[in-house]
Amino acid sequence: MELSLHDRRKEVRKAHDAELTLVVDDPLPAEVRGRLVDISRSGFRARHSYPRFEPGQQVRFRYPASQGQARVMWNRILNGSVETGFLVL
């Protein structure tokens, strides 16, 4: 029996709606504004309009409750917007 994505997650995710700023320096500097979708103890998912994030890429992030560095884990385009999963470092 195959488990759903929700069943395979190691941590509980909580819906969270807040403004978010992501800063990437490589390959080209960019500041990306978006919104949090959900958070967990080790990461978060964000919706934004920047399609160039690549898995493994490191970014700086800032939202009202936290700031720090994170690694891009996945990136997908859905209905004209981009969603990215991040692991907090």
Region spans (language model):
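Structured alpha-helical
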Residues: 1-89
